[in-house]
Each structure stands twice: as structure tokens, then as C-alpha cells.
Amino acid sequence: MNRIMLRGIQCYGCRSHVIQSFLAIADITFPAPLYHKPYTRSHLQHQSSFSSLHGQSFRGQSVAHSTSSRDPLEDNGTEQHPDSASHQSNEHVPWYLREESSEVPPHPLGSRQSIPPLPDNPPPILEGLLQHISVDIGLDDLSLLDLRSRNPPPALGANLIMIIGTARSVKHLNVAADRLCRWLRSTHKLHPTADGLLGRNELKIKLRRKARRAKLSSNAGSAFDEKDDGIITGWICVNVGSVENGKAAATEQKQDFVGFGSVADGAQIVVQMLTEEKRAELDLEGLWSGNFPPRSASEIRMFEQHFEAFAEKAVAEAANGRAAHRDPRGVRGTGSGMDHGQRRGLHTIRRVPNISVEAAVLGPAFIPRQGATVQQEPRLGPAPSVPPKASKPLNLSPETASLLHHLTQVPKDDAIRELGSGPQDLTSTLFLRLFQEALSNAEQNPDAHILAKLELIRVAVTLQHPHYSKTDLFDAFKEFAASGYDISESQALKTVKALLSFAENDPDGSHTAKRVSRSDIDLALKVLNHMSLRGMDILSREVFSMLYTASGFQVPVRPVNENPSPSSIETETSIPVSAEEFDEVRLVQDRLRKIMDAFDVKFGPDQFLTLLRFHFHHGNYDQFWAIWRKMSLLQLPRSKEFYVLLFRLHAERGNQKRAAECLSSWVPMMAREQPAVAIDADVARVIMACLLVADPDVKQRADNGDPGEYPSLWDRCWNVLVASKATQG
């Protein structure tokens, strides 16, 4: 009978209810039915499936019937907890019975492919052009700059609209520019021009030739010059030309307008296509939007009024100044009857104006260049006296210099204790009392305390004193600059080096990647700007070396998006940083390197050591080896210090593959250097540390007498260390 009853019930859900009723009598628990979770279907789906429609109507009756049939049994003790039933139903709902969510998750690339909104009164061609650039050509991150209100207009033309887009590669950049020009010619009958675009086969041929030259240079053992040769510029500017402009609001034409020709009515559209790296480097949006805000007619009139008032005030002050500087005794008359207040003459001395503290550093436009002999015209009457401090530099007294030198020789903790509690502390320690006494005894130069204060704060900042800040150092430099004395180049470089120094590590020993803050870099750049106006060459190798080091991290780092192999211990010796911060440092490095190449900055051995360490710590191995090989091309000898640094960096990094390549390639090259680099005790220690990274069992293999490259090199270094200890003993 049960078989006949089940055969009559065609719905699977109804069969489940019947079986559930029999199992409940036997006190057997059964998972909650799946159809209890409400499931909605569209109207079209209900009409398309008769069986599902019939099942839904029959299921409702069976549900009510089964519920009523189970009520008496549930009262007898077979009741289930409602929370457990709902929890089981949530766990056992299959994917084909789940409700479809109305909210569709956004695509990760959707924001990059969005089309910017149209400006007010757009040209008729603009909407179709944006659609074609985004959909058909495939440029990402489109931005639109409406420059039609610029006054004066940009050099590209009046009523300019600029579209900026990012190409996915250099090949995509050339293909996109070529297709856009062809589309404009065929569809809109325009004559666009594309600056930087190469032909379809020209780019392929030039890239093939460049790859061939690079391969030949690599086989010959020389470095390939990767300067910009015009092939891979990463930037193409497509000038669409003059198109019909949108209908603008009627404006009154200026009555006093003077000029030739008619006012331009059409709009100029320019499409800037760049690669992602080139767009981040140029930052066209920031250049056009931030530094040059649009000026309306009212703003221009207000500016003209302010300028006229400023000009009248300047003329009045100049007239008062001429009257005040005239000779009160009068001037002998001449037959010509000239106004001697306007007479010109020749100066034989230099007049140094009084300079305020803020104008000395933040606005030093009127500071004379050091060492410049200016021949000016003497005024009628007594010549103004020249301050004696402007003719010679300010030097420290021997007692003050000796105290500062002693501070650098004592241990760091003792030096910090002797410096007291800050710049305002003058008598809390014996050193500060002796320092103030030495300043008071310097009677021959009462302004010596200005330079002494600067040097004291500089030493404190270099020692990482907690109560001496870099702002105090900058204020001391401003006071020294306002005093009128000449600032030597060594004093300025020491100040910049202290401002660009890294902060001390945390006392709790937390591993964080330290960087110089942007505010400290701004202070250092202000000092360099002031010194450039005084005649100092700030494009020197020392300045670039300090800026290059301050732009990065203090310790070895790696981006968090990289997944090194678990067998390598490189993860233990490098600190993970965010990919955005890592890319920012790389971008600053590239810009500094391009500036150095443009000005042909020649580095010395000390700067090369700093650059090599910097690039290796930041994982820029290609640039590290490019600088290493460039030294031989510049005929700079790679001395013992360079090879000690090379092997120590690979040993500290802990990468087995790189350590093995370094040992096999550069240990034999030490004997070929001019002059040759011998393996002494210092070199032997770093080579043995590098050997332990490349082969952790090299010591046991060498003790067992195994033949091989690494055991023999280990024995050689061990013998050098034994001989060195015997010589010292």
C-alpha cells in the first residue's frame, strides 16, 4: 500500500514529507526539508514549466497536511528546536535552490574603464570620441580636462579640451594612436596629427634592431646604453584639430579689445595617450589642474586692480627713498641745470641689505650671491657703511670647536646625557656650562654663538637626541642665514645630511621599514634652495647621493605582493612593505636617476658604495649590477671595499641562488682587477659567510676533504684567517 501511495505522489517534496511522517513515529531525526527556505521564481519561469507550477500547488497542500499530522507527535516529545532547524536548513541548501542576489558585485576593472562625464556645452563630437577611445580602442583611466576658460589660452590652442588615457603597453599605445587617427579621417573627415607615433612596421623594425644591439653588447661583455632613443617614449599626443564647439552662453565682448583676426569659435581637442609609468611620471592632471586654476573675467579685473595699487605704492616708496638718501648739504650747481637726484654714477663697494629671518630661507629672492663683486653706482653724499660680517665667513673659536669634537668622540649615551634636555637647556650639565663659558669668552666675534648653536643642534640631531628636533636645526640655520655671514658649502652639506638622517629604531625592537618623513625632506630642500641662491652648486654628487638615500628605506625591504620560496631565508632578512609605498620609492628613484643622467653627474667611490647598498636593499638587482659594471666602463677600480660590500650584501640577504651566482662569477674576477684584489682576512670572512648561504654543509664537506669548488674556497679562506691570526699574535 505504501508503494501505491508513493507512486501516486509525483512530487519529490511530498514524498519527503510522507517519509518524514513515518520516521517521526520511529523517533528518528531527519534533516529539515530543503523546500522550507522560500524560493521565488519569475513569472516567465512559472509559465514555462507546468510541472513546477503543479508541484508548487500540490506542495502547499502536503505541507499543511504534514504539519497538522505531526502536531500530536511533537506534543508527545519529538519536538525539535527551531534554531537548530534553521541552522540545518541554512547548511544544506544547495546552490541551485539559493536565491539570486539582486546586487551584482562590481567588476574590479570597471572603474578603470569608466567614461568621464561631459563638460558644460560639449562639442558634438566629444561624446562619440570618448566612447570610441574607451570601448573600441581600449584606453583605461580616462580623464577629461576642460581648458576652454584659460586666459591666456594654452599653447596647443584656444578653447582646448584635453583627454588623457592610459595604454596597456608600448605596442598598444602605438596601435591605439594609429587606429584613432584612421577613425577620425574616415568617420569625421578630420586631419589629426600624432606626435610620437611610429608607423606600423617602423616600430617593429626599430625594436628588433634594438634587441639585436643589446644582444651583441651582452655577448661582448659591455653595458648596453638604455637611454631614451625616441623609440619607446611611452607618450603619444594626438591633436584632433579644430572641431565645432558647443553652444556657450552669450557674453559681452570687451570694448577695449585690441588685436588682429577674429575670435576663435571652434574647439581644439587633444588626446594624450601614455603608458602607466609615463603617466605617473608626468602627472599631466596635476600640472593642468593644480598649478593653473581657471581665471574668470572678474578674477582678472581684481588682479589688475591689485597690481595697479601695488605699482603706485612701489613708486611712492621709491620717491621717498630717493629724497631720504640725498645729501642734506646740497649739490653744486652745473650749467646744464640737471636734477642731480636722478644722476647716475659708479659704485666701488657692495651694499648688503638687511635680511629678515623668514626672507632668508623661505623667500630669498633678494639675497646676493656669495663671492659676487657687484659694481654699483655711488649715491650723492656719504656712502653707506658695509657690515664687516658680510665680507668674511663666521668661524668657531678653538675652545668651542674642541668641545664639539669631544662630544663626537664619547659614547652615544654619554653624549646624549651631556646635551641636556633641549636647545633651551644651558646649564644642566658640565658640558653645557663649559660650552656657554667658551661662547662668552669669544670677545673678538660676538656673533659666534649663532654658528655654535647651529653646530650644537646638528650634532644632537645626528646623535638622535629625543629633545632636539630637526625643526630646531632648521630654525638655527635660518638664524644663521639671516645674520649676513657667508655660509660655507661644508656647513650647508652637514646641515642637509642631518636633516635627511633616518630616525632611530624603536626601543621595543619592532621590525619596521624606516623612512625619512616628507616634512624633513622639505626642510632639506629649503636649505638647498637657499644655498643655490647664494651660488652653491646643488647639482653635485654629494647632494644627489643624500637625496637618493633619503628617498628610500633604511633596511632591506620587499613588497608584500611577492611570494618568495619557503626554502629561502630571504624572508627573515627583509621587511615587507606595501606595494604602493614600494612603487612610490621606485618612481622617485627613477626620476632622480633621470635627472642625474641629464646633468651628467659623476659619482666617486663613496657615492657608488652608497648607491650599491641602496639598490640591493630595495631589491633592484638590475640597477645594482648596472652600476657595478658601469664602474669598469668609467675606469674606476673596484677596490677591496667594493668586494667586501658585494659578498656581505649577498650573505645578509640570504638568497641561496644569488649567493651561488655571486661566488662563481666574482671570486675569479678579483684577480683580474687593476690593481688585483687579494683575499685577506676581511675579504675571507665575508666570502665564508656567503659560502654558508650558498651551501650550508660546506664546512662539513671541507672537513671531510670532499673535492669541489666550495670546499676548496672554504679551505683557502680558512688558511688566510689562520695566517692572519698568527701574524697578529
Swiss-Prot record:
Membrane topology value: Peripheral membrane protein
Protein name per Swiss-Prot or TrEMBL: ATPase synthesis protein 25, mitochondrial
Biased composition range(s): Polar residues: 59-70
Ranges where the record places region Disordered: 50-90, 100-119, 320-343
Function, as annotated: Probable mitochondrial mRNA stabilization factor.
Organism whose genome encodes this protein: Uncinocarpus reesii (strain UAMH 1704)
Encoding gene, per UniProt annotation: ATP25
Transmembrane feature ranges: none
Transit peptide: 1-60
Location in the cell: Mitochondrion inner membrane
Family membership noted in the UniProt record: Belongs to the ATP25 family.
Sorted UniProt keywords: Membrane, Mitochondrion, Mitochondrion inner membrane, Transit peptide
One Pfam family named in its UniProt record: RsfS
